[in-house]
């Protein structure tokens, strides 16, 4: 199992997100052997991290500025993001959980649609909580065979499942809830890992600008693809790796049944989220103690953020941002 911990921890670093994606590297093992006389831990691997990252310029759909010529452009938003993540592996699969607390600067103000008069916007930045869980069950481990493998191409196929949930104190007041289920494919690479999942995706959310009882919205069930990777950069002679994810959600409809009454609930577009981090194991470099402290820089691209599509008068749906942070493996 010596290859699993590094892969799992790299996956956790790559997913310090909000956002969507996500299970760590799978356990590739035959059926469990009989229990030894001295039972070991239930988990083959477990890692919990606390991290901080700074992101700029992030964007939010509808957060924009009007230029002198009357046109609109996206308003950049600095964000401070605090995260706790946990990953573990057991005989039959993996679990991954992450929670981001995202604090926006005043460019993305907090607000409510429930104030006296119906709308209020504050002079301080909004706070968002975004949680995500992904789990896998290895079909090879469950069957005690290697039937779910293609030598040299795929090491394992697993059942994959999970959910996302968020809340944010803006006037829009999103309360995203989604569930996913499908298959995960672990590719056979010389070092590190590349995993791809194909899911069915169902989302429920909230639009604070709709009137009751139509603030709660339910989107169509659509295909979703998640790709997670971590690859060591051994040729550098440094404890460096490149880690990240890509996430694709197909157009999921409007979310409302009465489109004539809520025409401003526009059709969603294909959503694409990609993040790539360059990760340095600082503990290994400085103290020769690996997997304790990581520092990272990265780039995030988000097209049609949360499915929203850009128009001439509606910006903030395309995000191109840089990030930098530090992560501590605590237990």
Predicted region positions:
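Short loop/turn motifs that connect adjacent beta-strands in outer-membrane beta-barrel proteins
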Residues: 36-46, 87-97, 139-158, 186-196, ...
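Transmembrane beta-strands of outer-membrane beta-barrel pores
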Residues: 52-58, 101-105, 161-169, 200-206, ...
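Surface-exposed strand-loop-strand hairpins of Gram-negative outer-membrane beta-barrel proteins
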Residues: 56-81, 118-120
């Amino acid at each position: 199992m010596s290859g699993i911990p590094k892969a799992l921890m790299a996956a956790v670093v790559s997913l310090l997100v909000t956002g969507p994606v996500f299970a760590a590297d799978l356990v590739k093992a035959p059926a469990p052997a009989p229990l030894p006389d001295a039972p070991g831990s239930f988990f083959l691997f477990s890692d919990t991290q606390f991290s901080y990252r700074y992101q700029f310029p992030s964007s939010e759909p509808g957060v924009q500025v009007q230029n002198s010529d009357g046109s609109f452009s996206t308003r950049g938003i600095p964000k401070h993001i605090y995260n706790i993540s946990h990953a573990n592996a057991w005989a039959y699969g993996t679990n991954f959980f992450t929670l981001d607390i995202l604090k926006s600067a005043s460019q993305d103000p907090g607000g409510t649609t429930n104030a006296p008069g119906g709308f209020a916007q504050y002079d301080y930045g909004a706070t968002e909580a975004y949680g995500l869980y992904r789990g896998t069950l290895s079909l090879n481990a469950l069957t005690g065979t290697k039937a779910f493998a293609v030598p040299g191409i795929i090491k394992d196929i697993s059942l994959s499942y999970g959910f996302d949930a968020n809340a944010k104190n803006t006037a829009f007041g999103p309360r995203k809830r989604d569930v996913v289920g499908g298959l995960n494919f672990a590719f056979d690479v010389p070092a590190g890992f590349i995993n791809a999942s194909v899911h069915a995706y169902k989302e429920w959310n909230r639009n604070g600008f709709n009137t009751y009882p139509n603030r709660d919205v339910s989107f169509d069930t659509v295909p979703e693809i998640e790709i997670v990777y971590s690859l060591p950069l051994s040729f550098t002679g440094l404890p460096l790796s490149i880690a990240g994810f890509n996430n694709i959600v197909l157009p999921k409809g409007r979310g409302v049944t009465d489109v004539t009454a809520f025409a401003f609930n526009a059709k969603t577009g294909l959503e694409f989220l990609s993040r790539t981090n360059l990760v340095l194991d600082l503990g290994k470099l400085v103290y020769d103690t690996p997997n304790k402290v990581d520092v990272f820089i990265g780039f995030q691209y988000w097209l049609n953020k949360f499915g929203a599509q850009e128009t001439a008068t509606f910006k903030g749906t395309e995000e191109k941002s840089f990030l930098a942070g530090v992560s501590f493996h605590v237990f």
